[in-house]
Amino acid sequence: MSTEKSRTWSWEFDSPPKVVWTALANTQRFNEAIGAPTYKVEELPQSDGSVISIARARKGPFDLEWEEAVVDRVFNRWFHQRRIFLKGPLKTLNSWLKITQTEKGCRAEFTIAATPSGMMGRLILATRFFSGPDRVLNQLAANMKSFADGTVETPYEVPPPTLALGSEARIRDLKEAIDQSPFSHGLTQRLADFAFKRQDADVSQIRPLALARLWNVPARHAVEVCLQAAKQGLLGLRWHLLCPHCQGGKGESASLDQLPVGEHCNSCNIDFDREYSGNVELAFHPAAAIRPVETAAFCTAGPMVTPHVVVQISLKPGETRTVTAELAHGSYRL
């Protein structure tokens, strides 16, 4: 008989819910930190306009395949992620995050539950399955105060990435060349630290405007130092054509003139056109000769993958649910 095994972690934080949400709801960073494998997704459009996402990965001796279900969420409050396995030692894997505001800050509860598909699955769940999340979540809790006050840029502690042989000298020379230009703006070292010390999930697409917000510097300075870093060979760059619905990059090119004039988003099952003012983005990544970055994802459906989606609920035909959410004043698309 397959019995679900689960574990719940609970903490009290002095930080407001939105800060804790930013850390705990980032499933890309979390999965990478616990040693989960990257995976590829095959998106299968259905006749009713919906899409079934089938993910495939390998972990140790196991070939894994599962259906990546829609992640229900209410921004800054809770999410529920479901995986239904078609191949591997597990039948199901679920995770929940619930954040409740308190007088001092908030309370967060994080639950992981899994159902084995056989004897090997039962053995895995009975031994080391929860040790990775336990280590990472306890680190997160310990680092939350420093993350909330801006002392550290990320609450996740991960081993430094493996760089190509001779990379340290190469990085040093390239930083000197950038600093000799009028476009470094004193940001060269911070950019190098970000590109060559942060998680793969953070550097596969380095967005200058996001760096500007993170570092509290003018957007133009962040853009110029990234462009200069690409010119010198510290970074690479790619132009992306973004889906107007999920905002994921569905078409890309190393040069703007080769970017497609239109694209189809398999995730959303829609066609869309290129609009330079609305859905064309320039993103950077570490130079592949120095730090090759895995292009597959650690999580394709988490809340922080589509942070502009503030409420997402999946319903069965005829089902109704009442959802409570705190939304900022503005326009929303239903």
Segments (PLM) and residue ranges:
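Hydrophobic ligand-binding cavity/cleft-lining segments
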Residues: 1-47
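Short, surface-exposed coil-to-beta transition loops
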Residues: 6-8, 63-67, 90-95
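A short, structured loop/turn motif at beta-sheet edges
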Residues: 14-17, 46-47, 71-76, 98-107
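Beta-strand/loop substructures that line and gate deep hydrophobic ligand-binding cavities in soluble
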Residues: 82-136
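A broadly conserved sequence feature marking short terminus-proximal activation segments
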Residues: 172-254
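Cys/His-rich short segments
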Residues: 216, 230-296
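Long, charge-rich boundary regions
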Residues: 273-334
